[in-house]
Amino acid sequence: QRQMCIRDRYKEKKGQVYTDNYRSALSTDRYILRGDAAGETYEPRFTFHGFRYVEIHGLERPLPLEAVKGIVLESIGVRTSGYETSDERVNRLFNNIIWGQRGNFLSVPTDCPQRDERMGWTGDAQVFARTATYNMNVDPFYTRWLYSVRDNQGDDGSYANYIPVVGFPPHGA
């Protein structure tokens, strides 16, 4: 029985991998290969990962790069802005912001898609809201999430630090 293992990894410097910020998240998928000579496709169905690099091992030979495909999941879509300068570093920064928004706007506005919790932190969502509205058509996304904010308002008028409230005391204000 052959098993392929896929791990998300953040590579900070050449040859160095940093995963401490994952906390308890393993960010590891294991797939038992059928042994199909024509090839196999693996796509996780009940999880998602935020990553920059992936590590695949357990195969007899390395996969060619074109055989590996990342799929972007997001709850927004239509980009409403563009930005380009003569400085490629600034262009890269803007594109990284767009990718960060796409990776963190999946059902609720999260602060990081790679860790062991993906909660709709109200402070992060509020701070980034203006930028988000310039970048993409987020009206339906924020409208739906703000209904959840209202639905989760405490009897005393307080709001939780994250919405929806799940599993932990909300420690709201």
What is each PLM-predicted segment?
Residues 59, 127-138:
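Well-ordered alpha-helical scaffold segments within catalytic/enzyme domains
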Residues 1-2, 169-173:
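Short, intrinsically disordered, charge-balanced linker/junction segments flanking boundaries
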Residues 130-133, 147, 151:
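Generic alpha-helical structural context detector
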Residues 127, 159, 172-173:
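Extended, hydrophobic alpha-helical segments in both membrane/secreted and soluble proteins
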Residues 3, 7-114, 123-124, 140-143, ...:
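Extracellular/oxidizing-compartment recognition motifs
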Residues 117:
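A glycine-rich phosphate-binding loop feature that marks nucleotide/adenosyl-phosphate handling sites
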